[in-house]
Amino acid sequence: MNTPVGVAEIVLGPGEVVFQTRPTRLRTLLGSCVAITFWHPWRRIGGMCHFMLPGRIRRHQPLDGRYADEAMEILIRHALANGTLPEEYQVKLFGGGEMFPAHRHDPHMRNVADSNVHAALALAEQNRLKLMAQDLGSTGHRSIIFDLWDGNVWVRHQPMEAMEKDAKQKNQRTAGR
């Protein structure tokens, strides 16, 4: 990860959408949320969103990056505003980790992670985007780093099983003191 000198770094929170036209490193942390990265390989511009839910009923309200369809619309508008077409971008999808796997089959619990994954895949298809990579589903959280100067996306996935195992080992070490 050779970082250009003086590169900006932006951390996205849930519901945020960022689009940059200069070398920038974008970061986010995902659980059941999904991140979509947009990168234009010739212009080396792009952005990322961190959406929380597939959609909402919107009546005369401004676009809101918390919702998949609206976050995608924001990214597409940025692409067009920069004289590029959405189809020219390399798109990657990340996240949608089940954070409560014990409740997976509970009929009273809505599976937000699965809904987000389906929404992201459907939006990529509907908008005829070049889906280059995806790391979706499973359990746990992901840390995402997206470098706009070269289009690389770095993912660290921590499945729930690994977190539970780490917690048990820590408890065993602590109990021995």
Curated annotation (Swiss-Prot):
GO terms for molecular function: protein-glutamine glutaminase activity. GO terms for biological process: chemotaxis. It comes from Pseudomonas syringae pv. syringae (strain B728a). The keyword GTP-binding does not apply. This is Probable chemoreceptor glutamine deamidase CheD. Belongs to the CheD family. The gene is cheD. Its EC number is 3.5.1.44. Keywords: Chemotaxis, Hydrolase.
